[in-house]
């Protein structure tokens, strides 16, 4: 086992604080509307340019192991805030640095770190309660656009495109971000339910322009096994042909004689039919077939519920206004399922989301909710170069997370104002002893840090602005984009409550751990062995002319 260095007390904390400062100083230059970029080296290809706090934090690894421990703990603040709220990583880092910087002075002065921590916890609980009271629900598309713009570093076009996407697919809808092909951002909306399975044979195509099979007012047959014998399908095909409507078959597989017969009937124009594979695998496939059945008002034909293909009636088939089947995707538009049944199914999946333990399962369940409840919107990010594309895409993703957080828990005044107002509203928070009081005082001072940093990045005088904002009331604050004071909500400077709350809680949590650290253990640096001496060259005779 490698030898370890053990460092105690003040020296340990001082080294950790150095690491915290190095990381936080690199991250905080990105804060606010006049925040700067950070350039990240890449081992190959062009460097990455970013204004995203967590992207900067993740890149930082310090040579000094003790400093690195401090930096890694603050990195945890940024990534936890990103995971929980999707934004606010820079604010969380700035708050953590401020709490550590103030707190280490108190600890050095001999105050009890554990009581300081208890005081910090009391203050944070009181501030979070005030933030929740001040929170205002996001109701309008304009507010959603404003939240998105602020999170995307004051880029109004990004805020607007996210608000448009949410208008189209609903607040529960799936919104994905992809690389665009042009210089402008574009929004593509897929209405209805789309799943990633296309036609089983190109002979089903009836629209050569779109290279797709379009079915108007079709029936939908859902079967959970393979279909290889056409005899099994004949009763259904005869009933559908009599009704004179097209048919979409969704099964585990359609192969052999069954597929060949369907293709021949389609080519001859006897029957308009398309076959696709069922989406998903295993248990997820069954669940998705059930989703499609509820959406279209049909049933999944499965032996376990006593249904077989021979006994299928038209009442067992689903229906939709229109279905488009492409090479890789199938889209069901305006299914005939009852709204109450769809709502009940969505509620059931939401309960599963709450109980899900893995992120992957949760994501897949959320996709299913979105497909049932709304639709899918794709934001295609446009840029002139690949470097700009990456930077812009990261900002769009940040803005998307922030708007979701705003919809979830509401909004508060942005620009660091909400924390100052929470401090005023919390009034006189009392600790059980003077050391706890010091912890409370520490937090109340530290929460000025985000506003101070926004002003500093805009080239202003932080103390003057903080005093002016503290003397104001309500949503009165400072707009660093144009150096004016006014009502932050009216100026469209908003933060999601969840983002501000999560940033404060995570910063206080990790900063408390740093302040209560009394010893650090790290691998001792290896002594570089001296290079071996050059061997004797011997007599190099015979060199004379």
Curated annotation (Swiss-Prot):
It is an enzyme of class 5 (isomerase). It catalyses: ATP + H2O + a folded polypeptide = ADP + phosphate + an unfolded polypeptide. Transmembrane segments: none annotated. Residues 526-545 are annotated as: Disordered. Keywords: ATP-binding, Chaperone, Cytoplasm, Isomerase, Nucleotide-binding. GO terms for molecular function: ATP binding; ATP-dependent protein folding chaperone; isomerase activity; unfolded protein binding. One of its GO terms (biological process) is protein refolding. The keyword Disulfide bond does not apply. The gene is groEL. Together with its co-chaperonin GroES, plays an essential role in assisting protein folding. The GroEL-GroES system forms a nano-cage that allows encapsulation of the non-native substrate proteins and provides a physical environment optimized to promote and accelerate protein folding. This is Chaperonin GroEL. Its EC number is 5.6.1.7. It comes from Paracidovorax citrulli (strain AAC00-1) (Acidovorax citrulli).
């Amino acid at each position: 086992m490698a030898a370890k260095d053990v460092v105690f007390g003040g020296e340990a904390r001082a080294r950790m604080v150095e690491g915290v400062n190095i990381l936080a100083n690199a991250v905080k230059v990105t804060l606010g509307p006049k925040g700067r970029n950070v350039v990240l080296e890449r081992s190959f290809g062009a460097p990455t340019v970013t204004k995203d706090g967590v992207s900067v934090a993740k890149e930082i690894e310090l040579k000094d192991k003790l400093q690195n421990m401090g930096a890694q703990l603050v990195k945890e603040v940024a990534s936890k805030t990103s995971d929980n709220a999707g934004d606010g990583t820079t604010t969380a880092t700035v708050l953590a640095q401020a709490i550590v910087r103030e707190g280490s002075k108190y600890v050095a002065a001999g105050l009890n770190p554990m009581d300081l921590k208890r005081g910090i916890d009391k203050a944070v609980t009181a501030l979070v309660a005030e933030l929740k009271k001040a929170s205002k629900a996001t109701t309008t598309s304009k507010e959603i656009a404003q939240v998105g713009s602020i999170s995307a570093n004051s880029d109004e076009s990004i805020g607007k495109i996210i608000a448009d996407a949410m208008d189209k697919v609903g607040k529960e809808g799936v919104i994905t971000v992809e690389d665009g092909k042009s210089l402008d951002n574009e929004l593509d909306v897929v209405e209805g339910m789309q799943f990633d399975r296309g036609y089983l044979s190109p002979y089903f195509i009836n629209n050569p322009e779109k290279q797709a099979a379009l079915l108007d007012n079709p029936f939908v047959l859902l079967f959970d096994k393979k279909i290889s014998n056409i005899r099994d399908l004949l009763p259904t095909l005869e009933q559908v042909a009599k009704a004179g409507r097209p048919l979409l078959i969704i099964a585990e597989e359609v192969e052999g004689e069954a597929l060949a017969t369907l293709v021949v009937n389609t080519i001859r124009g006897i029957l308009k039919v398309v076959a696709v594979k069922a989406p998903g695998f295993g248990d997820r496939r069954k669940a998705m077939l059930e989703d499609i059945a509820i959406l279209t008002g049909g049933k999944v034909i499965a032996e376990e519920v006593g249904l077989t293909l021979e006994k299928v009636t038209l009442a067992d088939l689903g229906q939709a206004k229109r279905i488009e089947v492409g090479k890789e995707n199938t889209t069901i538009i305006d299914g005939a399922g009852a709204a109450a049944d769809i709502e009940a199914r969505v509620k059931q999946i939401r309960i599963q989301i709450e109980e899900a333990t893995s992120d992957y399962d949760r994501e897949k369940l959320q996709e299913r909710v979105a497909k049932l409840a709304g639709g899918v919107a794709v934001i295609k990010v446009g840029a002139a170069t690949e470097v700009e594309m990456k930077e812009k895409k990261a900002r769009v993703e940040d803005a998307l997370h922030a708007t979701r957080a705003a919809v979830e828990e509401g909004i508060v005044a942005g620009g660091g104002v909400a924390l100052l107002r929470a401090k005023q509203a919390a009034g006189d928070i009392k600790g059980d002893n003077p050391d706890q009081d010091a912890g409370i005082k520490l937090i109340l001072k530290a929460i000025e840090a985000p506003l101070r940093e926004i002003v500093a990045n805009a080239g202003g005088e932080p103390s003057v602005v903080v005093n002016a904002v503290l003397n104001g009331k309500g949503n009165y604050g400072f707009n660093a984009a144009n150096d004016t004071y006014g009502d932050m909500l009216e100026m469209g400077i908003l933060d999601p409550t969840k983002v501000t709350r999560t940033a404060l809680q995570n910063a206080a949590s990790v900063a408390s751990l740093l302040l209560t650290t009394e010893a650090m253990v790290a691998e001792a640096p290896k002594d570089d062995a001296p290079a071996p001496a050059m061997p004797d060259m011997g007599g190099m005779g015979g060199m004379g002319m």
